[in-house]
Amino acid sequence: MPDGAASPDLMAEWARWQDAGLKARFWLRDDDAVTATPSLERLIAMTQVFDAPLLLAVIPAHATHALAVRLRGLDRIRIATHGWSHRNHAAAGMKQSEATDNLATGRSSDDVLHEIATGHRQIGTLFAAQSTGFFVPPWNRMAPAVAERLGETGVSAISGFGWRRAETPLPWLNTHIDLIDWRNGRSGKPLQTLD
């Protein structure tokens, strides 16, 4: 495969869409934002060059006023609530998750939902019109009991990762391609490996 070429699976999928007369909607999601950084500046520049919409998942407990000021007026950028503090509350030996109850520590679903509601209100206050009703669970995971009741927090949609959608009352709009190689240096993946 030539350098810079997309994977055969991705190209085949795009061909199927074209044959069916479908048009892919492309948008980006970036997680873990709390303040303006050089990396975020590069991402903002890229979204402007390519006119690509961006859903920026902001951690409410650590979000800064400086971030809100930097993003103000950028109409292709919308803000999602990204948990509360991005702290792992999963039981020992389980995959990381903030949006989970943990009976061993006394953390209930009500506790989790309270944090999410507080974070959602804080994001709305800080980012005003750019704020969305989206909730992006840290590590793209949440307990089923939390997902079932998420609408009680003011959140109106969920964005996770992958093609699967959990059975919940709220709609999901997931990302489907991860551009970052998290296990090998946390850098961008080569185009030919995206599928």
List PLM regions with ranges.
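C-terminal active-site subregion of NodB/CE4 polysaccharide deacetylases
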Residues: P2-S39, T153-D195
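Short, electropositive alpha-helical surface patch
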Residues: M142-S156
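Active-site beta->alpha N-cap acidic-glycine motif
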Residues: P2-R78, T132
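Short loop/helix-cap segments at secondary-structure boundaries that form the rim of catalytic
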Residues: V69-L74, L150, R165-L170
